[in-house]
Amino acid sequence: MSNILGLDVGSKTIGLASSTGNVAKKEINLKFEEWNFEEGVSLLTEFIKDKSFDTFVFGYPKNMNGSIGERAEMVDYFIEGFMVYNPEIKEEQIIRIDERRTTKMAKSIMIEAGLSRQKQKENKDTLAAQLILETYLEKIKK
């Protein structure tokens, strides 16, 4: 099985999760100045440089009606910058997974686990990335 990185890209954070098999595990949350995607891409590039990821699964936040909205366009913009910084990564290595409701699911999981508001804030993006990656892993299992 391949080495896969799941990503939940926001306006000032990138939650990361990884998998080398059937299970997604949380990695880290990269923080950057709000809307400074060049900084976000740089941090992500630094994170992956000594790792051998061959698939990158980006959460793609479609609107509830399935259309592409501002948040999905933001992810497309981020991916474009990521590929410019990392020309060795090819388009076929980039996967976009519909991530409607993953952040809400992550919050529900953390509330049920009894995490404090501070812990929820710290972990919501990495947990969302883990859920995005698990969605992809389930999809490729079929």
Curated annotation (Swiss-Prot):
This protein's GO cellular component annotations are: cytosol
SMART domains of this UniProt entry? YqgFc
Q: What is its main location?
A: cytoplasm
Q: What subcellular compartments does it reside in?
A: Cytoplasm
The record ties this protein, via SUPFAM superfamilies, to: Ribonuclease H-like
Biological processes annotated in GO: rRNA 5'-end processing
Q: What is its EC number?
A: 3.1.-.-
The record, for CDD domains, names: YqgF (cd16964)
Q: Which InterPro entries match?
A: RNaseH-like_sf, YqgF, YqgF/RNaseH-like_dom, YqgF/RNaseH-like_dom_sf
> According to the UniProt record, what class of enzyme is this?
hydrolase
Function of the molecule: Could be a nuclease involved in processing of the 5'-end of pre-16S rRNA.
Its family? Belongs to the YqgF nuclease family.
* Protein name in the entry: Putative pre-16S rRNA nuclease
